[in-house]
Swiss-Prot record:
It comes from the Bacteria. Belongs to the universal ribosomal protein uS19 family. Keywords: Ribonucleoprotein, Ribosomal protein, RNA-binding, rRNA-binding. It comes from Staphylococcus aureus (strain NCTC 8325 / PS 47). The keyword Metal-binding does not apply. The lineage of its organism: Bacteria, Bacillati, Bacillota, Bacilli, Bacillales. This is Small ribosomal subunit protein uS19. GO terms for molecular function: rRNA binding; structural constituent of ribosome. Protein S19 forms a complex with S13 that binds strongly to the 16S ribosomal RNA.
Length: 92
């Protein structure tokens, strides 16, 4: 279910403060965050976030196409190793 339009998009305050602090500086550092639930705003474009996936921080560079999505969508939490191959051919 989508979030109510009345409420507006959600972003953690501490994350917004970190982005606004870097807006004035020339050198953009990687912003480390655990907030996977935060919505990507237009002023996040061009910044790199290190989003926590449960084990490590995954670098996510924000582009125009990502606006409106959540940060957690771009840092998968599960590693897919592939299905086990069928051994019927090798048993014969």
């Amino acid at each position: 279910m989508a979030r109510s339009i009345k409420k507006g998009p959600f972003v953690d305050e501490h994350l917004m403060k970190k982005v606004e602090a870097q807006e004035g500086s020339e050198k953009k550092q990687v912003i480390k965050t655990w907030s996977r639930r935060s919505t990507i705003f237009p002023n996040f474009i061009g910044h790199t976030f290190a989003v926590y996936d449960g084990r490590k921080h995954v670098p996510v560079y924000v582009t125009e196409d990502m606006v409106g999505h959540k940060l957690g969508e771009f840092a998968p939490t599960r590693t897919f190793k592939g299905h086990v191959a069928d051994d019927k051919k090798t048993r014969r």
